[in-house]
Amino acid sequence: MPELPEVETSRRGIEPHLVGATILHAHIRNGRLRWPVSDEIYRLSDTPVLSVQRRAKYLLLELPDGWIIIHLGMSGSLRILSEALPAEKHDHVDLVMSNGKILRYTDPRRFGAWLWTKELEGHNVLAHLGPEPLSDEFNGEYLQQKCAKKKTAIKPWLMDNKLVVGVGNIYASESLFAAGIHPDRLASSLSTEECDLLARVIKAVLLRSIEQGGTTLKDFLQSDGKPGYFAQELQVYGRKGEPCRVCGTPIVATKHAQRATFYCRHCQK
């Protein structure tokens, strides 16, 4: 599933081609996504795009009368086309722009979403989200306060959007490795120093992935059709049985809440 770096990479890739241009029309080939494509999107015509923003894993296209909320789901990606290339099987939505560009949404598993809202504040998919991990609000003090009485393992807690948004399976595993923290540790067992370190490495790992265009493991592509290159720098995720890049101990893979977790028994305590 695309996580924060992949969504931010998509935002940065599409923004220059959309902001200041006008949506001439939307071409919806298959509106049966996780939720049906909103009727207002079908009716878009001569609508300028004012900004392209991100909240958590949602892309937000600001229009004069409302917002398009896009979620990439498990396998979605957005590409900017310079010409109307023939659509393939999983190309479900096109926004045809006045500058000759086309924003094409591809989603093999159709778990993504294209929603419309007049107001962002209070929308049900955004209302209960925690802070952005790259914001000043997310720091060691905040993390310690939220972990102090939490009797659950730290890995699934990091992936809870009520704690912090956008830290999915890949980046939770990578951040815990970078901080030297075992994923099965109770959140409440983390010290002040560990919370401070973990908050800092989460920011560092996410920023590094954004610099590399995100992580492509299967479906994700950047807006120019290229893969993200952070996969080449993964320390533990997807490396079951391979030697730890730090100590040489084989990487272990376990399941937490039906999600794969990767870690090093020697480096993470």
Swiss-Prot record:
Binds 1 zinc ion per subunit. The keyword DNA damage applies. Signal peptide: none annotated. InterPro entries: DNA_glyclase/AP_lyase_DNA-bd, DNA_glyclase_Znf_dom_DNA_BS, Formamido-pyr_DNA_Glyclase, FPG_cat, MutM-like_N-ter, Ribosomal_uS13-like_H2TH, Znf_DNA_glyclase/AP_lyase, Znf_FPG/IleRS. The active site is at 2 (schiff-base intermediate with dna), 3 (proton donor), 57 (proton donor), 259 (proton donor). It catalyses: Hydrolysis of DNA containing ring-opened 7-methylguanine residues, releasing 2,6-diamino-4-hydroxy-5-(N-methyl)formamidopyrimidine; 2'-deoxyribonucleotide-(2'-deoxyribose 5'-phosphate)-2'-deoxyribonucleotide-DNA = a 3'-end 2'-deoxyribonucleotide-(2,3-dehydro-2,3-deoxyribose 5'-phosphate)-DNA + a 5'-end 5'-phospho-2'-deoxyribonucleoside-DNA + H(+). Coiled coil: none annotated. NCBIfam families: fpg, PRK01103.1. Involved in base excision repair of DNA damaged by oxidation or by mutagenic agents. Acts as a DNA glycosylase that recognizes and removes damaged bases. Has a preference for oxidized purines, such as 7,8-dihydro-8-oxoguanine (8-oxoG). Has AP (apurinic/apyrimidinic) lyase activity and introduces nicks in the DNA strand. Cleaves the DNA backbone by beta-delta elimination to generate a single-strand break at the site of the removed base with both 3'- and 5'-phosphates. PANTHER family: FORMAMIDOPYRIMIDINE-DNA GLYCOSYLASE. Belongs to the FPG family. Monomer. This is Formamidopyrimidine-DNA glycosylase. It comes from Salmonella schwarzengrund (strain CVM19633). The lineage of its organism: Bacteria, Pseudomonadati, Pseudomonadota, Gammaproteobacteria, Enterobacterales.
